[in-house]
Regions:
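Conserved, single-site charged/polar hotspot
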Residues: 8, 19-386
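Sec-dependent N-terminal signal peptides
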Residues: 3-16
Length: 386
C-alpha cells in the first residue's frame, strides 16, 4: 500500500514523538570507504558546527549551506566555499531544530547519502564518520537498506524492524572500544541513511520498541536469510553452537518464491579437483567419483559422509559461491549440475517465507514465533535501561 504525503508526514511526526522515549546510538557511517574529501550539506533544520569543541561560526548552518572536509596530514581541513576555516582533529554538526537532515557526498563513495540528526568526524588514520541518531530512526534506515523492494506489506516491515532492533540492542557494545556502537556495513547491519519510505516508517512506528526474547527474557540472535528452500537449518549444524530457538523445521511458506530454487553447472574436472585437493587422491578413483556425482539432499545435511571422510556442505557452498548448502548433484556428460534450494544459511527467519505468511494473513508476532522457537515479543524498556 502506498501512503499519501499527509500520512507520510504524520508518521514522521509520530515517530518523532515516540523518539522522545527512545534511545540514541552512535553508528559509524561510510565505514567501508576510505574518504579523503567529503561535502557535508545541510538539507533541513539548523546545525551548530563545532571544531575541536569550539563554535567557529556565529550563526548556525542552514539548508543549502555546505562544508568541505579534507583529510590531510592526519588532520581535517575545513573549508566553506572558497574560505579556509582551519585544520582540526574533530568536527561536529549538531542539529538544533526538528527534522535535522544532512547529506554526505564524495567522489569516493557510491552515491550521496542522507542522514538524520548529528554527525561527528574524527581524525585518526582516516576520517571516522559517526552518525549520532535516534534508535528508531536508525532501525527504519536499516530496514530500508536491507529489504526495500522485497515487499510492500507493513506487517513484513514490522517483522524486519523488530528483528533489526533486537540485533542492534543485542550487539550494542560491538564497537564500543572504537568510540561507537555499530557500523553501517553488513558486519553489523546495512545502514545507508535515513528512511524515506512511508510503509517502512509505519512498520517501524507500529512495532515501536518491540524486541524478541527467549524463554529466559534474553535478547535472541535474530538470524535470517532470503529463502529456506522449504526447510530451515539448525544453528548448531552451521555455527557449532546449540541455540534452542534456532532449530530446523519444515517451512512450506518459502516454497515457490523467487529464491526457492537455483541451479549451477560446474565442469566435471573442477568438481573432482575440489575433493582431491581437500580430501586426497582417493577421489581420483571411479568408486569415490561415483559417490560425489550422485548426492541427494531430501532434507538439509550439514555433513556429507563419504566412507571415512566428513565433508561440510557449507565448505562446498563457500568454495563454489553457491546460493545455499542445500543442493543435490547430477552428472551429465562432462558437467556436474547442482540443483539447489533456498538462498542463504537457512538459519532463523526466511524473508520470503515471512512475506508469504503475511499475504496469508498471519500476524507479525505469529510469524516471528514460527521461525524462532519458544520466543516472546516484548518492549525493550522492560529489560534494558539507557
Amino acid at each position: 500500500m502506498r501512503l499519501s504525503k499527509t500520512l507520510y508526514l504524520f508518521l514522521l511526526i509520530a515517530l518523532a514523538v515516540n523518539n522522545a522515549f527512545s534511545a540514541d546510538i552512535k553508528v559509524r557511517v561510510l565505514s567501508s570507504y576510505n574518504v579523503k574529501t567529503v561535502d557535508v550539506k545541510i538539507i533541513s533544520g539548523n546545525y551548530m558546527m563545532l571544531c575541536n569543541n569550539l563554535k567557529v561560526f556565529v550563526n548556525d548552518l542552514i539548508p543549502d549551506e555546505a562544508i568541505t572536509l579534507t583529510f590531510h596530514n592526519n588532520q581535517i581541513r575545513v573549508e566553506k566555499g572558497i574560505e579556509f576555516i582551519g585544520t582540526y582533529n574533530q568536527i561536529e554538526f549538531i542539529g538544533k531544530k526538528y527534522n535535522n537532515v544532512f547529506s554526505l557526498s564524495s567522489t569516493q563513495i557510491d552515491r550521496k547519502r542522507y542522514y538524520e540528526e548529528d554527525l561527528m568526524i574524527t581524525a585518526r588514520h582516516e576520517m571516522l564518520f559517526i552518525n549520532h541518531v535516534d534508535l528508531e530512526k536508525y532501525i527504519a534506515g536499516v530496514v530500508q537498506s536491507e529489504v526495500f523492494g522485497s515487499s510492500e506489506d507493513v506487517e513484513f516491515f514490522k517483522i524486519q524492524a523488530t528483528v533489526s532492533r533486537t540485533y542492534c540492542l543485542a550487539n550494542l557494545n560491538r564497537h564500543l572500544k572504537e568510540g561507537y556502537n555499530l557500523c553501517d556495513d553488513v558486519h553489523c547491519q546495512s545502514y545507508k541513511g535515513r528512511c524515506t519510505n512511508g510503509d517502512i516508517l509505519r512498520g517501524t512506528f507500529e512495532s515501536f520498541s518491540d524486541v524478541i526474547v527467549d524463554s529466559t527474557n534474553k535478547l535472541i540472535s535474530t538470524a535470517y536469510h532470503s529463502n529456506s528452500g522449504g526447510m530451515t537449518e539448525d544453528a548448531h549444524k552451521i555455527w557449532q553452537v546449540k541455540v534452542p530457538y534456532l532449530l530446523s523445521k519444515v517451512d512450506t511458506f518459502s516454497i515457490g518464491a523467487k529464491n526457492y530454487q537455483w541451479e549451477k553447472a560446474i565442469p566435471r574436472q573442477q568438481w573432482i579437483n575440489f575433493f582431491v585437493i581437500r580430501y586426497g587422491d582417493a577421489y581420483k578413483s571411479p568408486e569415490k567419483q561415483e559417490q560425489i556425482f550422485n548426492f541427494q539432499q531430501k532434507e538439509r545435511i550439514a555433513k556429507w559422509v563419504i566412507d571415512d571422510d566428513t565433508i561440510s556442505t557449507k565448505d562446498i557452498r563457500d568454495y563454489f559461491k553457491l546460493r545455499s548448502s542445500y543442493f543435490s548433484v547430477e552428472m551429465k556428460k562432462d558437467t556436474v549440475y547442482l540443483h539447489g534450494k533456498g538462498y542463504g544459511h537457512g538459519v532463523g527467519l526466511s524473508q520470503e517465507g515471512a512475506i508469504k505468511m503475511v499475504q496469508l494473513g498471519y500476524s507479525y508476532i505469529d510469524i516471528i514465533r514460527f521461525y524462532y522457537n519458544n520466543v516472546s515479543v516484548i518492549k525493550y524498556t522492560d529489560i534494558i535501561e539507557f
